[in-house]
């Protein structure tokens, strides 16, 4: 994502985050700050590309899919890893393989950047998402993700 892409990224991600029932069920635990939080996040990626990036898939009609990558260091691998977050394909384009192409291209790009693993969290009540990622080579882990908000811009 570059500066001119911010408005398209904002539209795509705000639609996803405001409608995804699985995200909404956990949004309070995430410390969701709504549209201001999303806007701040997009500009953080522009200002600090070392933290991660927003990956967008385009077709003739514009943005068809989007995802967010955040970098981390794995102490078990002793290497750079990536957290895949907020993956979405436009509602009227789902089922066309855009998500698969998006993730495969993302894996190629991250490999070039020496990223050794991609982690993704899937909501327990979303077996379709789990099956999607497993088809793309992701393996289930015997753990559950927890969140603890320690500070927001409001407090």
What label would you give each PLM region?
Residues 42-56, 83:
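A short helix-loop-beta-strand connector motif used in the catalytic cores of GNAT acetyltransferases and
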Residues 103, 110-121:
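Conserved GNAT acetyl-CoA-binding A-motif
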Residues 69-76:
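A conserved beta-strand-loop-helix scaffold within acyl/acetyltransferase catalytic domains
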Residues 134-143:
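Conserved acetyl-CoA-binding loop of GNAT-fold acetyltransferases
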Residues 89, 95-108, 131-135:
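Conserved acetyl-CoA-binding loop-helix of GNAT-fold acetyltransferases
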Residues 94, 120-129, 147, 151-152:
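Conserved beta-strand-loop-alpha-helix junction that forms the acyl-donor binding cleft
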Residues 3, 10-43:
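Conserved GNAT-fold acetyl-CoA-binding loop/helix
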Residues 52-67, 90:
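Conserved beta-hairpin
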């Amino acid at each position: 994502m570059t500066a001119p892409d911010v408005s398209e990224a904002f539209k795509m991600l705000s639609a996803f985050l405001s409608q995804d029932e699985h995200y909404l069920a956990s949004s309070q635990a995430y410390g969701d700050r709504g549209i201001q939080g999303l806007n701040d996040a997009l500009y953080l990626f522009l200002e600090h590309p070392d933290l991660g990036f927003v990956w967008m898939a385009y077709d003739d009609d514009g943005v068809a899919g989007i995802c967010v990558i955040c970098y981390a260091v794995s102490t078990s691998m002793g290497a750079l890893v990536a957290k895949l977050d907020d993956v979405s394909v436009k509602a009227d384009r789902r089922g066309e393989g855009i998500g698969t192409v998006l993730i495969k291209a993302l894996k190629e790009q991250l490999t070039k950047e020496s990223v050794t693993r991609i982690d993704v969290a899937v909501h327990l009540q979303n077996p379709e998402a789990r099956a999607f990622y497993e088809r793309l080579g992701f393996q289930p882990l015997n753990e559950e993700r927890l969140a603890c908000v320690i500070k927001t811009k409001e407090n």
